[in-house]
Every structure is written in C-alpha cells, then in structure tokens.
C-alpha cells in the first residue's frame, strides 16, 4: 500500500500502481470536473501514471492554471507531429512548455521556414488533433532509446547527457518523442492554440552548434482565453520600449558601432540624467559616498576576485599591452570598490562604509540575447558596496530594503516580489566551495527578511558565485519578470582581498561586504519606465515638460519665446514647435510625442498676457496666468505625480 496526501490535506492508503484517474473516480469526481493531468510530488504526470510511492497528489482540472503548463507541453508535441508530416526530414531537439506557452527547436535541414508557413502548420495541427491520438508514456532502456532515435543526432546527444537517468518516450499515433512526461490524455483536448513567431536558436544554447529554428506558440482550453491573450500581446507590442522609441526618439543603436551599444539621444540623455541625479541625491541622503572608478583593470584584479574563474564567459577578451600588462573591460564594479576600501586602514567606527557608483561596465552578451535596452553589452549599474561589521549585517540589510521601497514608491513601482536566491550545493564549479560560509550567509538573509514580515520565495541555483542574494523581481508591462534590485551577502571577497578593520580591542577583523543595486542598470530601468508608462512620463521625469505652440509662427513667436525663457528660468523643460504647419497638426504631434503640457499662444493670450494650456490625454483647455501655471507644475513635480 502507498500513502497519498490529497490537496485537501486528507491522507489515504491505496494499492501500489493506483493511478490518479482511479483516485479521481473514487474520491474526487463529484467536486472536481474535467481532470486533465496531475501533480505528484511537484512533478507533472499523466492521469494514467501508476503511483508506486508515498507522496502529495493534486489532480488538475481544466480550470486549474497549472493545467496550462501540461496543455502547452502537449501542444508542443502536437506541433512536432504536424511538422513531421509536412517536413519528414525535420529533426527535433527540445520542445518545453514556458511561462505563457511553448516552443520547439527544430533543424529543418534543407528547408527554410518563415512566419508565412505558420498558418499551414496550424492547419495540419488541427487535422492531427481531430485524429484524437492518446498520449502514451513508456519507459525504455537507454539502448532502446538510441535505436528509436538513431536518425536524430540531437536526441542521441541528449540521451548521452542523461544516460544515468530513467528514459521515457511519448507515443501519439506514429510520432514518438523523448520526454519526461506531463501530458493531457488525448490530442482532441487541444483546440485553441496559436503559433506566434519564429526565431533562431542554437542547440543547447551554444553558438558553436548549428543554427536551429525556434517556433513559439500558446494554447488554452477556452477560445475566449486565447482571444484575451492575443489582445494582451497586442497591448504589449504597443508598450514595447523599442517600438515606442520610434516616436519618442530617446536612444539609438548603430550597426557600424556595434551590437548592444546604446546611444542616448538628447531627450533620452535628459531622462537618464534626471534618474541619475535622483539616485545619487537619494543615496547621498542615506550616507553613501559616490565615487568614479576606471572602466577597465589589470586582469589579475579579476583573478583575485574570482570573476576570471567564474565569470569569464561573460567578459570581453583580455587586451595584451606592449609592456605585457593584460587589461580587461570590467564586467563588475566590485573589485574597484575593494581597492577603495583597502586604500587606508579602517576603524570599526567608520563602518558601515557605503561606497556607491553609477558604474559603466561591459559584459559579453550573446548576439541572440541582446535586446533593446534590456540586454546590452555596455551598461551603467546603480551599484554600491556596503562594508559592515558582522554585528551590523541585519540592520544594514533592513536599511537597504527600506531604501528600495522608498525608491519604488517614487517611481510608482507596485508589481514586485522578493526572491531569496541560494546556491545549488551540487554545483561545485559555479559556487565557491565553503559549506559553512554559505549556510551562515543564507541563514542571515532569510532571518532578516522574515523579521521584516515581507513575503518571499526561494530559488535554488540563482545565487552569485560568492554568496546568496535577495532579488526584487518586478513584473514588467510586457509580462516578463526582471530583476530590478538586488542585495548580495559576501563573506568571500573581503577574504580574497584581505580587507580588515581595527576593532575596539585594536585587533584586525574581517568586514562583510553587502553588494546592492537599487534600480539595476540605467538601461534596464529606463526601458522599464518607458514600457510601464507607455511613454507617458510623469511630469518630473518627462524630457520635455511643456511644448509651446504659437498659432502663427510669424505673429506670435516673440511672445512664445518670452514664455519659454521664463519657464526655463524656473527650471522647467520647455520647447517651441515653430514649424509652418496647422495648429491642429502641431497639437496632434504633441500628443504623439506624449508631452505632458501643451501651451497654445495666440493673439488673445498676447492681448491679455495669459496662456492657454492642455494636459496630455485631456480634451479640455484651461486659460490662466503664467505664474499660476508655473506654481501648479512645481507642486506636481514636488509630489512626483
């Protein structure tokens, strides 16, 4: 007999090899409708999977959001079967379910596939689904699997990589795929799906391997849900910072200069400068010391820090100089800040010592990963390293968290969660091998966030190589999860750089370093602001706050220029649209540029020494004197509305 804990916390004993479907029929049929799969000990399984051990079981109905993962995984199999019929020579690699759908990486060999082919593949998928094949899992030996996939070199490589594991395959009609499982019972349940796009990829993410075709799709149980999701995708497209930038003209890239190297154009540079000043002023008010350090360093500095050993794949090649010195562009600011700390003997009275920098860094991102401002090769990180005594760790982390929340309030960031990232103890290559250090550091971070009563989730394998970290994961307007803020606890670098402070007993002691970034890189943060605000920035952030529009450039321009000079003298950012165009055209253009305020200047305003303004997104106009207008704007800026 096996003991199964159902989701309602009831425990029951069943004969070994009882299936989830049998349990549903006998115990849950009246309360749970339309089961499609199950979750056993946090692993997705089929309804006919024979249970042979104790564990936690959740039967998944169509209405359960978790079922979408199983549906999308099954739809990836359906797509592969349809493609095999259309392109018999296609070789399949991997086809997982992902957050909002699925993809499959395919080697089409001699065929070239484009998005024009997706409707044909979709049509074939519907045909195959109507055949209503069962999705049958079968355990096979390693040798049997090699015979089944002897024609596919990609599957053979995967089999060799997992030769110590149990091998299972999924049958659906004539199609067989290597798979761990988690499928719906029959293909006829797959009705409402859409193939979304095609991109390039490499087998196992290695650019040295052959280029593959990746087809993305999504699948839902209800037609209405698919329609709503496709509408959401259109909304996200409208918010994409790359698309919005075509009108806003904030930044650019140049193929002649290089991939992932952004240019900040005048309006974008203004926006960046506002954020930079805000961050620096905020950190200075929290007793940080801002510095500037070199963007490159002797390679030995990174050998000492451990970056050369653990992070070299993300670094640009070393430059050999004429005096045999080896220089590298820095991927991190940490070693430079260690040097500043080490410059002078430090007393325990000086700690915490908070060294901050808007530091330029260079990291080698693969060409396929570079994307707009979110993934670039040159970036500017809002970075700081807080050097503390061991007894100050918890209090300092709390202060950093409060600073993060303060900044989030000002930028109206509300969709986020804390993620506590640990090392994977089995990964001896990625992480520094000191079990006691890791256990101690992880316990401190967990204890601190628990004391603040902040909800968090845990993630194994996402720590930095030198220590655990507390990340703030922000949900973007495009539905992605991005790390915006991070707090990393480090006992290792002080040891590697032999950092010390003199305690009250005149003894040398080792400080602890807390790495922290409040708004990530400026590039990523600004892309987030563009998308979150859909290009409509609050007044305090807007690169151009007021656009002055003379009714007649020849008659009204002089008074318009006087107003502009007055606005500029008050610290406001104003421009004039003096184009020879109709008033309606100028107003529409101001709306497209998403400028917060437009002031129309005509004969009536000049005669009465007034202005007429309209706020972005509003139809009504207001006429007032310039002093009242400036006062209301200053109030709006002060309140960061």
Curated annotation (Swiss-Prot):
The EC code for this enzyme is 6.1.1.3
This entry carries the following GO cellular component terms, namely:
cytoplasm
Which keywords label this protein? Answer: Aminoacyl-tRNA synthetase, ATP-binding, Cytoplasm, Ligase, Metal-binding, Nucleotide-binding, Protein biosynthesis, RNA-binding, tRNA-binding, Zinc
Ranges for domain TGS come to 1-61
Entry-linked PROSITE patterns: AA_TRNA_LIGASE_II, TGS
Example GO BP: threonyl-tRNA aminoacylation
Please tell me where Zn(2+) binds in this chain.
Answer: 334, 385, 515
* Primary location group: cytoplasm
Q: Where found in the cell?
A: Cytoplasm
Record field: catalytic activity:
tRNA(Thr) + L-threonine + ATP = L-threonyl-tRNA(Thr) + AMP + diphosphate + H(+)
One GO MF term: ATP binding
Note on how the cofactor is bound? Binds 1 zinc ion per subunit.
Q: InterPro entries, from UniProt? A: aa-tRNA-synt_IIb (IPR002314), aa-tRNA-synth_II (IPR006195), aa-tRNA-synth_II/BPL/LPL (IPR045864), Anticodon-bd (IPR004154), Anticodon-bd_dom_sf (IPR036621), Beta-grasp_dom_sf (IPR012675), TGS (IPR004095), Thr-tRNA-ligase_IIa (IPR002320)
UniProt-annotated stretches for the region Catalytic: 240-538
Q: Which cofactor does it need?
A: Zn(2+)
| Its job | Catalyzes the attachment of threonine to tRNA(Thr) in a two-step reaction: L-threonine is first activated by ATP to form Thr-AMP and then transferred to the acceptor end of tRNA(Thr). Also edits incorrectly charged L-seryl-tRNA(Thr).
Q: Which PANTHER family match?
A: THREONINE--TRNA LIGASE 1 (PTHR11451:SF56), THREONINE-TRNA LIGASE (PTHR11451)
Q: How does it assemble?
A: Homodimer.
User: According to its UniProt record, which protein family does this protein belong to?
Assistant: Belongs to the class-II aminoacyl-tRNA synthetase family.
Protein name, entry field: Threonine--tRNA ligase
